[in-house]
C-alpha cells in the first residue's frame, strides 16, 4: 500500500488586483512586473476573509471531489504562515466548520515549501496504516503581511488555498520519493520585519531557489528510479517565472511539461504548489500513471520536492 491523491479542491478570493492597478498605487509598471516575474494579476482576500476561510472552502471541495464526507476524514494538515492566531490552529478551525468529528488537526509551517511538507507528512500516516483519509491544505493570506510600500515585494504576492485528499493507493502509484530540507543560516534572507511585514533579499533567495530546487529535483528522480524523460509534469513553486524556467531547464524538460499559474495568482506561498496542482487536474494536464514532480522553496530557508505517480 502507498499514499496517493484521491481528490483536489481550491479557493481563490473574488478580488483581482492587476499590474495596472498596482501602477496607480506605487511606482511600477505592468511591463516591469511581467518581464521580471511573469505575474499579471493576483487575488486579494477581503478584510473579513481569513486564512481559515480560504482553507475551509478548498478542503470542502477536495472532500467532495474525492467522493467522501467529512466523517470519513481522519486528519487535517494545513500548511500556512498566516494563521490569525497561534492557536487554535487553522486545521482545527476547519475541522470544526466541516463537522469532521472523527478527525484530528494540525498546522505545519515551512513557508512556500509547506504544502510539500504536508503531503509527505500525510503519506507517512497512511503508509503505516494509522490513518486512511487525510486532507492536506496549503492556504495563505499574504496580503495581510505584504509591505505595500515596498514595490520590490508588493507586486509578488497573492491569496488563495489549494487542497488534496490523500488516501491508500496501490504500491506502484502515489508518493514515489521525496526530499525535504532546511538551511536555517539563510533565515535572514526571507522573514518578517519588525512591523510583521515580508522582508526579502531577492538576490540571495533567487540563488538558493535555483540551486536547491534543481538539486532536490534530481535527488527525487534518482530515489524513484526515474529518468528526466520519465517526468510528465513539473509543478514548481509559483514564485517567479525565471526561477520556474531554471527548474525546467535543469531537468531538460520541454515547455509544455511546466505547469504555470504565476501569471494569474502571483506567489501565494503555502498554497502556491497546491493551487497549481489543482489547476493542472482541472485542465486535464494530469492523467493516470503520469509522474508528477512537485518542488518548492521557502522562508527558513526550506525546500521540498516529491514525485507522485497519479492514479490508484
Swiss-Prot record:
Catalytic activity: malonyl-[ACP] + acetyl-CoA + H(+) = 3-oxobutanoyl-[ACP] + CO2 + CoA
Protein name, UniProt field: Beta-ketoacyl-[acyl-carrier-protein] synthase III
NCBIfam families per record: fabH (TIGR00747), PRK09352.1 (NF006829)
GO cellular component: cytoplasm
An individual GO BP term: fatty acid biosynthetic process
Gene Ontology MF annotations: 3-oxoacyl-[acyl-carrier-protein] synthase activity; beta-ketoacyl-acyl-carrier-protein synthase III activity
Domain notes: The last Arg residue of the ACP-binding site is essential for the weak association between ACP/AcpP and FabH.
Keywords: Acyltransferase, Cytoplasm, Fatty acid biosynthesis, Fatty acid metabolism, Lipid biosynthesis, Lipid metabolism, Multifunctional enzyme, Transferase
Function: Catalyzes the condensation reaction of fatty acid synthesis by the addition to an acyl acceptor of two carbons from malonyl-ACP. Catalyzes the first condensation reaction which initiates fatty acid synthesis and may therefore play a role in governing the total rate of fatty acid production. Possesses both acetoacetyl-ACP synthase and acetyl transacylase activities. Its substrate specificity determines the biosynthesis of branched-chain and/or straight-chain of fatty acids.
Gene coding for it: fabH
PANTHER family hit by this protein: 3-OXOACYL-[ACYL-CARRIER-PROTEIN] SYNTHASE, BETA-KETOACYL-[ACYL-CARRIER-PROTEIN] SYNTHASE III, CHLOROPLASTIC
UniProt pathway annotation: Lipid metabolism; fatty acid biosynthesis
UniProt record similarity statement: Belongs to the thiolase-like superfamily. FabH family.
Quaternary structure annotation from Swiss-Prot or TrEMBL: Homodimer.
Domain of life of the native organism: Bacteria
Region ACP-binding, residue ranges: 238-242
CDD domains referenced in this protein's UniProt entry, alphabetically: KAS_III
Pfam families: ACP_syn_III, ACP_syn_III_C
Enzyme class at the top of the EC tree: transferase
EC code(s) of this entry: 2.3.1.180
Intracellular or extracellular location(s): Cytoplasm
Active-site residue numbers: 112, 237, 267
Amino acid at each position: 500500500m502507498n499514499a496517493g491523491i484521491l481528490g483536489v479542491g481550491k479557493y481563490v478570493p473574488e478580488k483581482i488586483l492587476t499590474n495596472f492597478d498596482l501602477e496607480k498605487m506605487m511606482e511600477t509598471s505592468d511591463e516591469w512586473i511581467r518581464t521580471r516575474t511573469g505575474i499579471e494579476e493576483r487575488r486579494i482576500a477581503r478584510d473579513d476573509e481569513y486564512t481559515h476561510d480560504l482553507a475551509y472552502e478548498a478542503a470542502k471541495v477536495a472532500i467532495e471531489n474525492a467522493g467522501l464526507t467529512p466523517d470519513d476524514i481522519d486528519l487535517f494538515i494545513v500548511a500556512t504562515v498566516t494563521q490569525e492566531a497561534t492557536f487554535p490552529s487553522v486545521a482545527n478551525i476547519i475541522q470544526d466548520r466541516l463537522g469532521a468529528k472523527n478527525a484530528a488537526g494540525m498546522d505545519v509551517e515551512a513557508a512556500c515549501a509547506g504544502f510539500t511538507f504536508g503531503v509527505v507528512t500525510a503519506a507517512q500516516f497512511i503508509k503505516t496504516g494509522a490513518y486512511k483519509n487525510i486532507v492536506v491544505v496549503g492556504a495563505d493570506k499574504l496580503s495581510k503581511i505584504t509591505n505595500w510600500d515596498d514595490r520590490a515585494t508588493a507586486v509578488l504576492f497573492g491569496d488563495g488555498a489549494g487542497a488534496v485528499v490523500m488516501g491508500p493507493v496501490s504500491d506502484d502509484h502515489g508518493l514515489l520519493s521525496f526530499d525535504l530540507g532546511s538551511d536555517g543560516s539563510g533565515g535572514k534572507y526571507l522573514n518578517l520585519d519588525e512591523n510583521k511585514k515580508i522582508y526579502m533579499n531577492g538576490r540571495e533567495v533567487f540563488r538558493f531557489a535555483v540551486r536547491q530546487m534543481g538539486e532536490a529535483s534530481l535527488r527525487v528522480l534518482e530515489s524513484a528510479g526515474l529518468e528526466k524523460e520519465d517526468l510528465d509534469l513539473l509543478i514548481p513553486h509559483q514564485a517567479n517565472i525565471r526561477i520556474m524556467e531554471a527548474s525546467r531547464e535543469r531537468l531538460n524538460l520541454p515547455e509544455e511539461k511546466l505547469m504555470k499559474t504565476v501569471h494569474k495568482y502571483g506567489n501565494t506561498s503555502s498554497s502556491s504548489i497546491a493551487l497549481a496542482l489543482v489547476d493542472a487536474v482541472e485542465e486535464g494536464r494530469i492523467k493516470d500513471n503520469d509522474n508528477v514532480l512537485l518542488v518548492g522553496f521557502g522562508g527558513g530557508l526550506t525546500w521540498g520536492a516529491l514525485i507522485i505517480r497519479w492514479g490508484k
